[in-house]
């Protein structure tokens, strides 16, 4: 169980193709034996990401919900999070002992953020293939997320991106806030993300409670 009232809600945002759904999949598979988990995804007109998680076997289908935001996906996680809050409430009613709810935003830009009503912790995912200037551009996702994930570091030599520059810029833009460089395809850096969620979110595994 969590160390606070209700399940820990972790919001995962980032541009289209950065690796949000891949991270959701890996987190579910890595944590489901130790914690009671549910996953919620956001898409504009489909439930593609939720269906992917079901096909991948991330969790059982009843623990995965897809929210069709219709229109701007940013609004559904910030200004009017009612659909996502309702999805969280439904999961809590089905699974009263939930420890963790992972909430993936629709593909968004650097200005998108999660409402504090919806997410207790926020993780923002960018990827190297978009260029090494991304961390320096700032925006709430870069500067204010609880954890910044710089994914697809294996592509750096192929796209002419400097990981050193991204490291320097991320430190400059984020100050004391942590970031991690990853290659989620090979699960490189995943352990650091897991450790961050457990420590920052105050999670206590089922094994520890037994």
UniProtKB/Swiss-Prot annotation:
<dbReference type="GO" id="GO:0043419">
    <property type="term" value="P:urea catabolic process"/>
</dbReference>
<keyword id="KW-0143">Chaperone</keyword>
<dbReference type="GO" id="GO:0005525">
    <property type="term" value="F:GTP binding"/>
</dbReference>
<dbReference type="InterPro" id="IPR003495">
    <property type="entry name" value="CobW/HypB/UreG_nucleotide-bd"/>
</dbReference>
<comment type="function">
    <text>Facilitates the functional incorporation of the urease nickel metallocenter. This process requires GTP hydrolysis, probably effectuated by UreG.</text>
</comment>
<comment type="subunit">
    <text>Homodimer. UreD, UreF and UreG form a complex that acts as a GTP-hydrolysis-dependent molecular chaperone, activating the urease apoprotein by helping to assemble the nickel containing metallocenter of UreC. The UreE protein probably delivers the nickel.</text>
</comment>
<dbReference type="InterPro" id="IPR027417">
    <property type="entry name" value="P-loop_NTPase"/>
</dbReference>
<dbReference type="InterPro" id="IPR004400">
    <property type="entry name" value="UreG"/>
</dbReference>
<comment type="similarity">
    <text>Belongs to the SIMIBI class G3E GTPase family. UreG subfamily.</text>
</comment>
<dbReference type="GO" id="GO:0016151">
    <property type="term" value="F:nickel cation binding"/>
</dbReference>
<dbReference type="GO" id="GO:0005737">
    <property type="term" value="C:cytoplasm"/>
</dbReference>
<dbReference type="Pfam" id="PF02492">
    <property type="entry name" value="cobW"/>
</dbReference>
<dbReference type="GO" id="GO:0003924">
    <property type="term" value="F:GTPase activity"/>
</dbReference>
<keyword id="KW-0547">Nucleotide-binding</keyword>
<keyword id="KW-0963">Cytoplasm</keyword>
<keyword id="KW-0342">GTP-binding</keyword>
<keyword id="KW-0996">Nickel insertion</keyword>
<feature type="binding site">
    <location>
        <begin position="14"/>
        <end position="21"/>
    </location>
    <ligand>
        <name>GTP</name>
    </ligand>
</feature>
<protein>
    <recommendedName>
        <fullName>Urease accessory protein UreG</fullName>
    </recommendedName>
</protein>
